[in-house]
C-alpha cells in the first residue's frame, strides 16, 4: 500500500464482490501502470519483553504518546493512556509503517518514530526493534530467517531511563504518604524559590584560587598563599555550617542553584568547603542523592574557586577504620572528580593514622591540608597535657610529612582569642607553610579569635555566610569581611556581592525548618565539657529522644567527666561520638563515672566506647588509663598499632561482583569504592534510584512535603530536557490499597499509582521471589497459572516440570533447574500472577 498507493484491503473487498481487477472503480488500470515508489517497512510494537524471551506483559498503559510526521502511518487498536492490556488476546499495541525514498530513509524514519513513542506501564519490544534497525546486516539488506538466532548482540538492550514516570511516582508517594524525613517535625512555610543574585552569565569568568593552583602546582601555590598580605576566607556554608545547624540535610539542588553566583561574585574566596565529613553518607542515606554527583555538578558550576573536603584520615568519610587500599582508592577517585583541597585529620591527633591518607593526597597533585585538632587550653597553666609545645611538635611533624597547609581544627570553639594569638604566632615562627584556622562559634566569641590570629599573620580562616553562621556553626563571614576592610588584612571580597549571596541563604534556610536544632545559648560551660560544634545540637536531640532534655546540664557535666575518665582525649568524630554515647548511657541509667570503674557492677558499655578504648580509633597521647582499659575492654586484647595495619586489603574484584548483582551492570571503580565504604547504605540508595530515579533536582519544598493541588515546577533532567510537573489531585483509595495521583507533565495528563500506607487493602500483595535465592521459583512473566505439577514434599529432579503459565495465547512451562525437594507451593490453577511473584519454594 505504501509503495504503490493502492488500498489493498479495499481492493480485496471489491474483488470479493465480483469486480475484475481491470474494473475502473478499482482504479488499478493496467498492470504496467502500477509502479513502486521508494521503500516502506513496518514495525509491530507489542507488549512483549525482549529481555525475557519475548514473554508477554500485561497491565495498564499509564501513558501513551505516539509518533507522527511525513511518511508515517499508525494502525492502532487499544493504544492510549489508561488502556488495559489483558492476558487473553494478542499483545500488539500498534503497527508503525513508514516510507522513504531510499531504504536508509525508511530506517532513519522508523528509528526516529520508535524513539518518539512513550509507552509506560507495560514493557514493549521497542528496544529490540531499535537494535535490529541499527544492525549492519539489516542495514545492508542481508537478513535471513536465522538472523535473530545468530545475532545475540540484538539482545544487548539499553536500559530505558523512564525518568519522568519514576519522578512522578516519587512525588506521588510523598503527596500520599509524606516524607519520613520530616514526619512529626515543623513544617516549612516557604514554597517559592530563593532569590538569586544578579550577574552576567555571559561575561568572562573571573580568575580565582583554582586557576592559581593550576598555574603554580600545590607547593608553589602554598608559598604564594603565604606571601599574600590579605586574609583568605574559606566559606563553610556548603558543608560544615549546615552539618552543624541542620544535621547535614541541605540538598544538592539548593547548593547548586547558588554555585555559579559564587564563581562570578566571590572569586576571591580561598575555597568552598563543600564535601566530606558527614555529607557523604547523609546524602545517600537521607537525601537519596549521589554524593559524587554533588561534587561533579558543583565543580562544573565553580571551575575557578578551590573546592575543599574534610577527610577523616583512615576513617575516610566513615565512622570506622578502612583498609589502606580503600582509603587510597577513595582519595584518588575524589581528586579525579575535581576536589582540590583535602583537609586531613585524625580524631586523636595520632600521626601514624594520618600517613596513608596524606600520602594518597600528595600522589594526586591536590593540596594536602594536614590538621591538628585543638583541645584543652594553652593559656591555662593547669592544662598541661595539650600545651603549646605539643601543638608545635605536631605541626613540625606534619610539615615534614609533606603537608602543603597546616589547619588548626578547633572543632569545639575552645581556642580563646589570646590562645589563638599565641598559637598562631608561635607556629608562624616554627613552620614554613600557611596556617588555616577552623573554629565553631559555640561560645559566641570566636570571631575575636580569628581577628587576633589575623594580627599575627594567620593566612586563611573559615567562616559561614551570615544566615548560616553563629552558634555551633562558624563565625559570620560577612561581618568578618567588613571588619577587615580598610586594614592591611582586608580580604578582597566584595561586601555588596556577599550580601546578595547572603539573601539567597536566608531564604533557603527557611526550607529546612524541620531540621532547625534547638538554639542553645552560648555559655562559658563550653570550656568545661569541650563538646565539638558538630556534636552539640545532635547530642541534645539524642537527649531529647531519651527524655533527658531537662537534664541537659547534667549530660554536659557527665560528658566532661567521661572525657577525664578516658584520659582527657581529643574529641572529634568518631571519638566525640563515643564520649557522647557514654555520657548519655550514664545519665539515662543514673550512673556516674565512678560506677564505670566499680568492678562490682556489670555494665554493658556502648560498642563505640569499647572500640575507642580498645584502640580501634587510634591512640591518644599517653594512651588510655589502664584501669579504664581493663574495665571496658575486659578480656579483649586492645590494639596498640595502627588499626589499618591489621585490616586485610579490600578485595575490589569480589566487591565488584557484589555490586554488579544489585546494579545489574558492570560497576565503575567509584561505585565499588562507595560500596566498600557504606555497603548497606549504598545498596539501599541504588534500590531507591532504580525505583524513583534521580530525585536531587526536585525543588526542596516538594521533596520534603510534596505539592499542593495546582502547584507546578520545572526540573532539568539533562541539558536541553526539562520536565514541567503540575499536581492536580488524588483519587479515592482503591480496593488494593493504591491511590492514583494525577499530574500534568509538560501539559499532558499523567498519573502515578501509589500504595497508601494508611489503607488496608482488600487482598494482600503476593510474596515476591528473591531472584538471588536458588530456592525461590518466581514467575518470569505476568499470566495465569494453568497447571501445577508438584506439591509440598515432592522430590524433584533437574528438568522436571513444576507448573505451566499462560498469557496472550502462549503457554510457558517452568522446569526445575536442579534436584531438590518442594517445600511450599504458593499458587494454584487459575491464579493470576505478576512478574517476580513467588510460586514455589525448594530446599
Region locations from a protein language model:
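ATP-dependent carboxylate activation and anion-phosphoryl transfer catalytic cores
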Residues: 1-183
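Long, charged amphipathic helices and adjacent flexible linkers at domain junctions
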Residues: 25-37, 152, 210, 215-218, ...
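Terminal or standalone catalytic/regulatory effector modules within metabolic enzymes
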Residues: 114-119, 147, 151-158, 163-219, ...
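Conserved, mostly hydrophobic/aromatic
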Residues: 233, 241, 344, 406, ...
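Active-site beta-loop-alpha junctions enriched in small/polar residues
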Residues: 239, 275-279, 310-316, 347-349, ...
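Alpha/beta enzyme core
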Residues: 252-272, 287-306, 316-433, 451-458
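Catalytic alpha/beta core domains of metabolic enzymes, predominantly
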Residues: 411-595, 599
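Structured functional modules or segments
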Residues: 769-843
Amino acid at each position: 500500500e505504501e509503495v504503490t498507493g493502492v488500498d489493498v484491503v479495499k481492493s480485496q473487498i471489491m474483488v470479493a464482490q465480483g469486480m475484475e481487477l481491470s474494473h475502473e472503480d478499482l482504479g488499478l488500470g493496467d498492470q504496467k501502470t502500477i509502479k513502486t515508489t521508494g521503500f516502506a517497512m513496518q514495525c509491530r510494537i507489542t507488549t512483549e519483553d525482549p529481555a525475557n524471551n519475548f514473554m508477554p506483559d500485561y497491565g495498564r498503559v499509564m501513558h501513551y504518546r505516539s509518533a507522527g510526521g511525513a511518511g508515517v502511518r499508525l494502525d492502532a487498536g487499544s493504544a492510549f493512556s489508561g488502556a488495559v492490556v489483558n492476558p487473553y488476546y494478542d499483545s500488539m499495541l500498534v503497527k508503525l509503517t513508514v516510507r522513504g525514498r531510499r531504504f536508509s530513509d525508511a530506517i532513519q524514519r522508523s528509528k526516529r518514530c520508535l524513539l518518539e513513542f512513550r509507552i509506560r506501564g507495560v514493557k514493549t519490544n521497542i528496544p529490540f526493534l531499535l537494535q535490529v534497525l541499527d544492525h549492519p546486516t539489516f542495514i545492508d539488506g542481508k537478513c535471513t530467517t536465522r538472523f535473530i538466532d545468530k545475532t545475540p548482540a540484538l539482545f544487548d538492550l539499553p536500559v530505558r531511563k523512564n525518568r519522568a514516570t519514576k519522578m512522578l511516582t516519587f512525588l506521588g508517594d510523598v503527596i500520599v504518604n509524606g516524607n519520613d524525613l520530616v514526619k512529626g517535625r515543623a513544617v516549612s512555610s516557604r514554597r517559592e524559590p530563593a532569590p538569586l543574585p544578579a550577574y552576567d552569565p555571559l561575561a568572562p569568568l573571573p580568575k580565582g584560587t583554582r586557576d592559581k593552583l593550576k598555574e603554580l602546582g600545590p607547593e608553589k601555590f602554598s608559598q604564594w598563599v603565604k606571601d599574600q598580605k590579605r586574609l583568605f576566607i574559606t566559606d563553610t556554608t556548603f558543608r560544615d555550617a549546615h552539618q552543624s545547624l541542620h544535621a547535614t540535610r541541605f540538598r544538592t539542588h539548593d547548593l547548586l542553584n547558588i554555585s555559579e553566583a559564587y564563581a562570578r561574585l566571590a572569586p576571591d574566596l580561598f575555597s568552598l568547603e563543600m564535601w566530606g565529613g558527614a555529607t557523604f553518607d547523609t546524602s545517600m542515606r537521607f537525601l537519596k542523592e549521589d554524593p559524587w554527583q554533588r561534587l561533579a555538578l558543583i565543580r562544573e558550576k565553580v571551575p575557578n574557586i578551590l573546592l575543599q573536603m574534610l577527610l577523616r584520615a583512615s576513617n575516610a568519610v566513615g565512622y570506622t577504620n578502612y583498609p589502606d587500599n580503600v582509603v587510597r582508592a577513595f582519595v584518588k577517585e575524589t581528586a579525579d572528580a575535581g576536589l582540590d583541597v583535602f583537609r586531613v585529620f585524625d580524631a586523636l591527633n595520632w600521626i601514624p593514622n594520618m600517613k596513608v591518607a596524606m600520602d594518597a593526597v600528595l600522589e594526586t597533585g591536590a593540596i594536602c591540608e594536614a590538621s591538628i585538632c585543638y583541645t584543652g587550653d594553652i593559656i591555662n597553666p593547669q592544662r598541661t597535657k595539650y600545651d603549646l609545645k605539643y601543638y608545635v611538635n605536631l605541626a613540625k611533624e606534619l610539615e615534614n610529612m609533606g603537608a602543603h597547609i597546616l589547619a588548626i581544627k578547633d572543632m569545639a570553639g575552645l581556642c580563646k582569642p589570646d590562645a589563638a594569638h599565641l598559637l598562631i604566632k608561635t607556629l608562624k615562627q616554627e613552620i614554613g607553610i600557611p596556617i588555616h584556622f577552623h573554629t565553631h562559634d559555640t561560645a559566641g566569641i570566636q570571631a575575636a579569635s580569628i581577628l587576633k590570629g589575623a594580627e599575627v599573620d594567620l593566612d586563611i580562616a573559615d567562616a559561614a555566610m551570615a544566615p548560616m553562621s553563629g552558634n555551633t556553626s562558624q563565625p559570620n563571614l560577612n561581618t568578618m569581611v567588613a571588619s577587615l576592610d580598610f586594614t592591611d588584612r582586608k580580604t578582597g571580597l566584595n561586601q555588596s556581592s556577599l550580601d546578595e549571596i547572603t539573601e539567597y541563604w536566608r531564604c533557603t534556610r527557611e526550607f529546612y525548618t524541620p531540621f532547625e536544632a534547638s538554639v542553645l545559648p552560648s555559655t562559658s560551660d563550653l570550656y568545661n565539657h569541650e563538646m565539638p560544634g558538630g556534636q552539640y545540637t545532635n547530642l541534645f536531640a539524642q537527649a531529647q529522644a531519651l527524655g533527658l532534655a531537662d537534664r541537659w546540664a547534667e549530660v554536659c557535666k557527665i560528658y566532661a567527666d567521661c572525657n577525664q575518665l578516658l584520659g582527657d582525649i581529643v574529641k572529634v568524630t568518631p571519638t566525640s561520638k563515643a564520649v557522647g554515647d557514654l555520657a548519655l548511657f550514664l545519665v539515662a541509667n543514673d550512673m556516674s563515672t565512678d560506677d564505670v570503674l566499680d568492678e562490682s557492677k556489670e555494665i554493658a558499655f556502648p560498642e563505640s566506647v569499647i572500640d575507642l578504648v580498645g584502640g580501634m580509633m587510634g591512640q591518644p597521647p599517653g594512651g588510655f588509663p589502664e584501669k579504664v582499659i581493663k574495665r571496658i575492654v575486659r578480656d579483649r586484647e586492645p590494639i596498640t598499632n595502627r588499626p589499618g595495619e591489621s585490616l586485610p586489603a579490600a578485595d575490589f574484584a569480589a566487591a565488584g561482583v557484589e555490586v554488579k548483582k544489585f546494579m545489574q551492570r558492570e560497576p565503575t571503580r567509584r561505585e565499588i569504592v562507595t560500596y566498600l565504604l557504606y555497603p548497606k547504605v549504598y545498596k539501599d540508595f541504588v534500590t531507591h534510584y532504580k525505583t524513583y530515579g534521580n530525585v536531587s533536582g526536585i525543588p526542596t519544598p516538594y521533596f520534603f512535603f510534596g505539592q499542593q493541588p495546582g502547584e507546578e515546577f520545572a526540573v532539568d533532567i539533562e541539558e536541553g530536557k526539562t520536565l514541567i510537573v503540575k499536581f492536580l489531585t488524588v483519587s479515592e483509595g482503591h480496593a488494593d490499597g493504591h491511590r492514583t495521583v494525577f499530574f500534568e507533565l509538560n501539559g499532558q495528563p499523567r498519573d502515578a499509582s501509589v500504595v497508601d500506607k494508611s489503607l488496608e487493602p482488600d487482598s494482600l500483595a503476593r510474596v515476591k521471589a528473591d531472584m538471588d535465592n536458588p530456592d525461590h521459583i518466581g514467575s518470569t512473566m505476568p499470566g495465569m497459572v494453568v497447571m501445577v505439577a508438584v506439591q509440598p514434599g515432592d522430590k524433584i529432579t533437574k528438568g522436571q516440570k513444576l507448573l505451566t503459565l499462560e498469557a496472550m495465547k502462549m503457554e510457558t512451562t517452568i522446569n526445575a533447574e536442579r534436584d531438590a525437594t518442594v517445600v511450599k507451593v504458593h499458587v494454584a490453577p487459575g491464579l493470576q500472577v505478576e512478574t517476580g511473584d513467588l510460586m514455589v519454594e525448594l530446599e
